[in-house]
Amino acid sequence: SGGGGAGLAAAVQANQLGSKVLVLEKMGKVGGNTILAGGALNAVNDRSEQAIAYNDSVEWHYTQTLSGGDYQGDPLLVHTLVSNAWDGVQWLMDLGMEFQDETAGLFTVTGGLWPRAHKPVEPLGTGFFKAYMNYIDSHDNVDVMLNTRATEILVDENGKACGVMATGETGNTVTVKASKGVVVATGGFAANVELRSAYNTQWADLGDSIKSTNHAGATGDGIKMLQKLGADFVQMGNIQLLPLGDPMTGSLSGNIEHDVETRIFINKEGNRFVNEGGRRDDMTNALFAQTDAYMWIVMDSDTYPTGDERNNFGETANQLVEAGRAVKADTLEELAEKMNVPADTLIAAVTGFNPH
């Protein structure tokens, strides 16, 4: 159950391996959180010129991923993830998904720690779903039911999952029998304030004041179903906060697109206060420590030479400026005035960063 990135990827591969598959999706369309994500996919091709140039490798990806999670991850699972990541990219390309050429598209995604992110040609996560749905629409024995909320995992007398109970669009009961098992791919719960607050062990507050980048359907339905069966959960308190986005809505819309290497974070005093290429939790904690937990993201015309370049939501930098969601200036002094920060500290921050 679940028609997001994980659910549809599982459905496609299960069908490729010979299984008859039905995906249940409670929303009116597929996509989940994946379609709202930036779309970048971290993977190392050991033989590529880019990986060699950046001194990257699968083992380095493994080391960074394990240490970046404070060694709480299962080493075997982490190694499985990173060692199969490039095969995953190739699998997606075989399905028809397009990625930018590595020389133009390999970059460091926020919190990614190294330039190994592959950027799709299509915006956000739309490229994934075009590939998945093109496959599903052109193959037998794999279907998607929309507006169908899974409510219970059915088990046989031996405790094996044998189907799913669901509620259809009109409130009707839908029973699906499964001979080979049930894949639960509907566990995201960032849009469920009660659930995330209950599991939270890391942050001071994850209540209503903290908005979510997730879609409205990320309410942890799969977790609730598995709880009824006595499933064992691990590390549920490791909830990620992203140091970006609209604090009023949580949306990433309105952000000027930027690479880790070409931006600096500036607080209300005009100071750069954190390594923008670091871990997401480190950046978020640093942001919370600033006045009003407020920052500007500063970049120059090397990133936006004309102002007509579009972000993942189709918005140009000029449009964001016109809407009052961004400012631009020809000099740092003028920019400081528009940001309402001291010019001398902003100039010092920019000149201190530029040699890097």
Predicted regions and their residues:
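N-terminal Rossmann-like FAD-binding beta1-loop-alpha1 element of flavoenzymes
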Residues: 1-23
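Conserved Rossmann-like nucleotide-cofactor binding loop
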Residues: 6, 29, 271
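Glycine-rich FAD pyrophosphate-binding loop
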Residues: 15-37
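Glycine-rich active-site loop/strand segments that organize a redox cofactor
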Residues: 43-81
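A short alpha-helix-loop-beta-strand transition element characteristic
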Residues: 72-77, 91-105, 232-235, 274
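Conserved redox-cofactor binding core of oxidoreductases
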Residues: 83-174, 192-195, 246, 356
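Glycine-rich loop(s) and the adjacent beta-strand/alpha-helix scaffold that form part
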Residues: 169-245
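An anion/pyrophosphate-binding glycine-rich loop and adjacent beta-alpha core
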Residues: 219, 223-225, 231-341, 345
